[in-house]
Amino acid sequence: MMCSSKNLLLAALMSVLLLHFCSKSEASNFDCCLRYTERILHPSILVGFTQQLANEACDINAVVFYTRKKLAVCADPKKKWVKQVVHMLSQRVKRM
């Protein structure tokens, strides 16, 4: 009976440690925008975008544009040109 309790405790401890290390590795692999580009990007070089929200993982709100050359470029979602490009890309997707 004593051996069974020790095994159960060991299994519970190992589970907690495994969950702890898995959650740490996911957070450290997450890329966040730390600053915005100063350049205005032309929509013809862009293939898509995502939105980054400021939360416990990332410090700033951003629109992340993806280029044909597979680059990710962070832009300020408050800028007029960013809103226009997001609208254009959204319209492009709707037409597909």
Curated annotation (Swiss-Prot):
User: What is the name of the gene encoding this protein?
Assistant: CCL20
- GO BP field: calcium-mediated signaling; cell chemotaxis; chemotaxis; immune response; inflammatory response; T cell migration; thymocyte migration
Keyword annotations for this protein, in alphabetical order, are:
Chemotaxis, Cytokine, Disulfide bond, Inflammatory response, Secreted, Signal
Q: Give the protein's function.
A: Acts as a ligand for C-C chemokine receptor CCR6. Signals through binding and activation of CCR6 and induces a strong chemotactic response and mobilization of intracellular calcium ions. The ligand-receptor pair CCL20-CCR6 is responsible for the chemotaxis of dendritic cells (DC), effector/memory T-cells and B-cells and plays an important role at skin and mucosal surfaces under homeostatic and inflammatory conditions, as well as in pathology, including cancer and autoimmune diseases. CCL20 acts as a chemotactic factor that attracts lymphocytes and, slightly, neutrophils, but not monocytes.
Protein known as: C-C motif chemokine 20
Q: Which cysteines are joined by disulfide bonds?
A: C32-C58, C33-C74
Q: Is Signal included in the keywords of this UniProt record?
A: yes
InterPro entries listed in its UniProt record: Chemokine_b/g/d, Chemokine_CC_CS, Chemokine_IL8-like_dom, Interleukin_8-like_sf
Q: Which family does this protein fall into?
A: Belongs to the intercrine beta (chemokine CC) family.
Range of residues in the leader sequence: 1-26
Q: Which Gene3D superfamilies match?
A: 2.40.50.40
User: SMART domains annotated for this entry?
Assistant: SCY
Q: Listed GO molecular functions?
A: CCR6 chemokine receptor binding; chemokine activity
Any one GO CC term of this protein is: extracellular space
**Organism, as annotated:** Bos taurus
Subcellular localization? Secreted
